[in-house]
Amino acid sequence: MIKDFVAIDLETTGLSPYDNKIIELGAVRYRDGKPVDQYNTLINPGVHIPERITEITGIDDDMVSKAPYIDDELDRIMEFIGNDVILGHNVIFDYTFIAGALAGHSIEYSAEAIDTLKFAKKVLSAN
């Protein structure tokens, strides 16, 4: 069982890492299975947040207007995540947005990722 990892969750302006932007990133670092640190920031996407996304996330244009842009926050995000295993629900979604932002700076990123959605599907289908 993995006891050291970073759990992440993103909110975005849509589903495509090519066409949409990150608007919030939250992460919690675990050591020995216990939370030891957290990181959370709103991100200014530089574009209008669609009304539907505001309905889903509660995040609107005013909330992100003074938030940092993803380019200004990437170093802090990656410093927090480090080389840890990434854990999240449908984590491939979050992973592709982060990797896409890094690729825009010619930074390759690969880390082990554990998707709790896959575990949930297995558990639920077994019952």
Identify the residue ranges that each predicted region occupies.
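A short, structured active-site edge motif that brings together acidic residues
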Residues: 111-120
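Conserved non-catalytic scaffold segment of RNase H-like nuclease domains
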Residues: 1-112, 125-126
